[in-house]
Amino acid sequence: FTPMMRSHGADTPREIYQFGKKGEPVYDAIEKMIRLRYSLLPYIYSTSWEVTHRQSTFMRALVMDFPRDKKVWNMNDEYMFGKAFLVAPVLEAQYTPEKVVKVDEESGWNRDNAGKADERVHVDFMQQKSAEVYLPAGTAWYDFWTNEKMEGGRTVTRATTLDIIPLYIKAGSIVPLGPDVQYATEKPWDNLTLRVYPGADGSFVLYEDEFDNYNYEKGAYTEIPMAWDDSSRRLTLGARKGEYKGMLQSRKFTVLLPDGRQKAVSYNGKKVSVKF
């Protein structure tokens, strides 16, 4: 949950297969997060455009969105990822002891300082842990993993495992999710899922371009405005603005609510709405 995701290791291998194999907890946890990251590309790409074009901010201190809640004024262990996600990273090791390893900018890791374990230690990574999370006041929140809805202005205890961090969605959010891919442009975004979180009015602008060049600087891009009216329970997809070579002329969206209800919407660039 950062603007860019890179798994670097100066001279320490970081490939996923260095951490076990499929079916083992560490490997599976890494794979789960990589797949989640790729599914969020429509949200991430659109939010990046907000940063570029409208001077928005990606990783947002809570005070930026909830200035009236004094409890978040000096909070430094939670943040908003875009305007929909509240991220509460687990900042202390929950399964294995931490070890500080010195690094030298010339020679890399000090391997003698790193040391090695005296013996193999079995770690139960599936043992459930927990973390406390403050949900800002003034809005309702949804647990991203379970879709449980809860009111803001209180601290909750969230169960955590190796593959789950506390992650909440602000009521009124519209979150587009993309296909399961191995690389960013493997599949077209012709059937995105739009997760809508009721409880407040909300909006989102889906941004798209050719994805692999600078033609957007010449105006080659599109925006699709989306708006959720909470009182009427209606999602409206506005008329598409702009164009670029190879853009999808028609497509489908699957609109999904936290309670599991969903509806398919055909979209050809003209305003259309769906009611729940």
Predicted segment positions?
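Accessory, solvent-exposed terminal regions and/or long lumenal/extracellular loops of proteins
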Residues: L162-K271
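Catalytic-domain carbohydrate-binding cleft regions of carbohydrate-active enzymes
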Residues: F1-I164, I169-K170
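Solvent-exposed, conformationally flexible loop/turn segments
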Residues: M126-Q128, G153, Y267-F276
